[in-house]
């Protein structure tokens, strides 16, 4: 089997599993990448991410160019045609190669009889491309987001929703966190320059560096030795607001994959940290991160709603709750989120967040700090959540972040800045 020929069909199968079966791309893609040569892995990733980023447009084009949708066992061909459109619109793959390889993909998915159909649709698109794209530019699909999410963003951000959508449709910058126990940020930036790369410090987060051009981690000075970690700037804000101190008992709840756990220990190496997550499989990445950075923490599997099951009656000086959320602030990194989430999920997530907040608040010592964080931009999960929590929790007070009417700090995704993130810093009276 020609691996190069198979690339397009693998991408089509990955997108189908996300859209039709509700699988996350981070679970679907790695096993498929094992089926292609190393030199082809980047292209496979680009095709999967790109098709999911522009899915609304590609779906719109198929509806314009085909009289009826592909269904049943032929459904993968629907996504194979999308992969073809994406290459013609957004990649440097020569058009003749894009067509030939995509058409050949029908053989890999055991649909060789549909090669002529695929070829015909792609060539029809080439002939009508300018007219079709002009029409698309005035359609509702042009936002590249599901309609329910566009409406929620319009309601929440009447003057900024388009900026958020544009940011979500861009490729994300690559942010790093310099391990302050090994190097100062300026010192590591010097090592980066010596390696022929350039980075820029974040003005607000003292460990954050943005690479001018994304690079593989093995090319970063000292990555294997734990000198630096890949972590978005906004995610680094969690430890900044938490302000952990040596000797404190700290709970990092919903901790996987461990980026925030290790950041806490970089800021306060002698803190006693308990990292808890409900997903046992993802906890393996917490262990991996601790090992790479040479750090120690207690790691437990547990549900945030039932702290007695994983910490008994223990109380903590500080709690970081990176709550389960819609992840609508990190769509540019995970474009599958747009198609995995449903409108009804938001109410269910807000209810879960409230239950976890109420369950862990008694575990915070008087005078202690709880930082509530999400990678969402939706008020129901953020400001509204904290506002109602403050109303029902008389011993909770807001600190540093916002006002009682507008509690918390909301970062919006954009350009070279960090992802969409929300933080609220609460003090126990």
Curated annotation (Swiss-Prot):
Region (Disordered) residue spans: 397-419
InterPro entries: MeTrfase_RsmB-F_NOP2_cat (IPR049560), MeTrfase_RsmB-F_NOP2_dom (IPR001678), NusB-like_sf (IPR035926), NusB_RsmB_TIM44 (IPR006027), RCMT (IPR023267), rRNA_ssu_MeTfrase_B (IPR004573), rRNA_ssu_MeTfrase_B_ent (IPR023541), RsmB-like_ferredoxin (IPR054728)
GO molecular-function terms, A-Z: RNA binding; rRNA (cytosine-C5-)-methyltransferase activity
EC number, as in UniProt: 2.1.1.176
Cited Pfam families: Methyltr_RsmB-F, NusB, RsmF-B_ferredox
The entry's keywords: Cytoplasm, Methyltransferase, RNA-binding, rRNA processing, S-adenosyl-L-methionine, Transferase
Binding site for S-adenosyl-L-methionine: 254-260, 277, 303, 322
Record GO biological process: regulation of DNA-templated transcription; rRNA base methylation
Subcellular localization, as worded in the UniProt entry: Cytoplasm
Any one Gene Ontology cellular component term annotated for this protein: cytosol
Catalytic residue positions: 375 (nucleophile)
Entries under PROSITE patterns matching the protein: NOL1_NOP2_SUN, SAM_MT_RSMB_NOP
Compositional bias ranges of the Polar residues kind: 400-412
Catalytic activity: cytidine(967) in 16S rRNA + S-adenosyl-L-methionine = 5-methylcytidine(967) in 16S rRNA + S-adenosyl-L-homocysteine + H(+)
Entry's family note: Belongs to the class I-like SAM-binding methyltransferase superfamily. RsmB/NOP family.
Known function: Specifically methylates the cytosine at position 967 (m5C967) of 16S rRNA.
Protein name as catalogued: Ribosomal RNA small subunit methyltransferase B
Top-level taxonomy: Bacteria, Pseudomonadati, Pseudomonadota, Gammaproteobacteria, Enterobacterales
Gene coding for it: rsmB
């Amino acid at each position: 089997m020609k691996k190069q020929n198979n690339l397009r069909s693998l991408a089509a199968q990955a997108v189908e599993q996300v859209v039709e079966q509700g699988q996350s791309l981070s679970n679907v893609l790695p096993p498929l990448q094992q089926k292609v040569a190393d030199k082809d892995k980047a292209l496979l990733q680009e095709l999967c991410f790109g098709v999911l980023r522009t899915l609304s447009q590609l779906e719109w084009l198929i509806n314009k160019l085909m009289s009826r949708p592909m269904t049943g066992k032929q459904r993968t061909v629907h996504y194979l045609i999308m992969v073809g459109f994406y290459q013609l619109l957004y990649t440097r793959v020569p058009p003749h190669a894009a067509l030939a390889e995509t058409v050949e993909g029908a053989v890999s998915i055991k649909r060789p009889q549909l090669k002529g159909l695929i070829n015909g649709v792609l060539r029809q698109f080439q002939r009508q491309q300018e007219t079709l794209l002009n029409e698309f530019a005035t359609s509702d699909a042009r936002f590249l987001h599901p309609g329910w999410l566009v409406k929620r963003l319009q309601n929440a951000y009447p003057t900024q929703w388009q900026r958020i959508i544009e940011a979500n449709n861009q490729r994300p910058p690559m942010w790093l966190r310099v391990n302050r126990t090994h190097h100062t940020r300026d010192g590591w930036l010097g090592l980066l320059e010596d390696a022929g790369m350039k980075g820029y410090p974040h003005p607000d987060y003292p460990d954050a560096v943005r690479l001018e051009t994304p690079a593989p981690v093995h090319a970063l000075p000292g990555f294997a030795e734990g000198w630096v970690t890949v972590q978005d700037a906004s995610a680094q804000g969690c430890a900044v607001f938490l302000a952990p101190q040596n000797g404190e008992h700290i709970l990092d709840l919903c901790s996987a994959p461990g980026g925030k756990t290790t950041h806490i220990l970089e800021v306060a190496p002698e803190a006693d940290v308990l990292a808890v997550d409900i997903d046992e499989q993802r906890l393996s990445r917490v262990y991996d991160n601790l090992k790479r950075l040479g750090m120690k923490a207690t790691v437990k599997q547990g549900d945030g709603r039932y702290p007695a099951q994983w910490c008994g009656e223990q109380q903590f000086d500080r709690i970081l709750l990176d709550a389960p959320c819609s992840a609508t602030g990190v769509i540019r990194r995970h474009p599958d989120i747009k198609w995995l989430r449903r409108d009804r999920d938001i109410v269910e997530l807000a209810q879960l967040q409230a239950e976890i907040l109420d369950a862990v608040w008694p575990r915070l010592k008087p005078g202690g700090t709880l930082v509530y964080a999400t990678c969402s931009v939706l008020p129901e999960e953020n400001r509204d959540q904290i506002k109602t929590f403050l109303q029902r929790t008389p011993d909770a007070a807001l600190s540093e972040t916002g006002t009682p009417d507008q509690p918390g700090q909301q970062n919006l995704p954009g350009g070279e800045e960090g992802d969409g993130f929300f933080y609220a810093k609460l003090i126990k009276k």
